[in-house]
Amino acid sequence: MDELFKAIILGIIQGITEFLPISSTAHLVITPWIFGWSGIVNSLSFDIAVHVGTLISLLYCFWKDWINIFFRERKMLLFIIIGTIPAGIAGIAFHDLIESALRHPLIIVVTLILVGFLMLYAEKVGKKLIRSITLSDAVVIGTAQAIALIPGVSRSGITITAGLFKGLDRAYAAKFSFLLSTPAIAGAAMLDFYKSIKIGHSHDYSLFIIGVISAAITGIIAIKFLLSFLQKYPLNLFIYYRWFLAVVIFLLYFFRN
């Protein structure tokens, strides 16, 4: 199959699933596995592209917030820095493990189900208050973001869940989750770029551009949709989807093996 077509499809999947609480890694691992795709799946050009694309989505949707954070809300900037540290440490320390052993389909099945139950419980017990982020919130949600490095967990899913457990309003927890993910995604893009330089990887710029555009456009749509959705509805729709996806992956794995 044409590599450009794969880039478009996987870029769209990345843009949508990076920001919805359904795990982008699960979808990017499972989609090529289902269709038997190779090539672009292991391309550093594409890895960098989707990170850049989703970063563009975040900056487009929250550039006004970032201006306020840098020039007026310095405390929020400090909280974002503190919240980014756990994921940074975990990403460097466990990178090889995450990229190899933890990408097994059955591990993704387990994490999809377990985090779904966590999301459901958080919806029931969370107080959902509209209040300012505290240092404690930043530490807890930042630690949750580190856990999201495990495939199937979902960065937005686990961080919004952590915010709900801390008593934050659903939509506000999602917004802080997105702000917190910005430096993490930027860091991932820079790490991949560094790896590409280190190994002398030659970039396929057509795949890069297609990946950036498809991930950025769908990412913007996904962010705006989720923030609007969570102002009115609970996380149940995404919880049920996670469980459905887990069953599909398990059945496919069972019948293929």
Curated annotation (Swiss-Prot):
Keywords: Antibiotic resistance, Cell inner membrane, Cell membrane, Cell shape, Cell wall biogenesis/degradation, Hydrolase, Membrane, Peptidoglycan synthesis, Transmembrane, Transmembrane helix. InterPro entries: UppP. GO terms for molecular function: undecaprenyl-diphosphatase activity. The keyword Cell inner membrane applies. Coiled coil: none annotated. GO terms for cellular component: plasma membrane. The chain crosses the membrane at residues 4-24, 51-71, 78-98, 106-126, 133-153, 171-191, 207-227, 235-255. Its EC number is 3.6.1.27. It catalyses: di-trans,octa-cis-undecaprenyl diphosphate + H2O = di-trans,octa-cis-undecaprenyl phosphate + phosphate + H(+). It is found in: Cell inner membrane. One of its GO terms (biological process) is response to antibiotic. Pfam families: BacA. It is a multi-pass membrane protein. Catalyzes the dephosphorylation of undecaprenyl diphosphate (UPP). Confers resistance to bacitracin. Bacitracin is thought to be involved in the inhibition of peptidoglycan synthesis by sequestering undecaprenyl diphosphate, thereby reducing the pool of lipid carrier available. Belongs to the UppP family. This is Undecaprenyl-diphosphatase. It comes from Thermodesulfovibrio yellowstonii (strain ATCC 51303 / DSM 11347 / YP87). The gene is uppP.
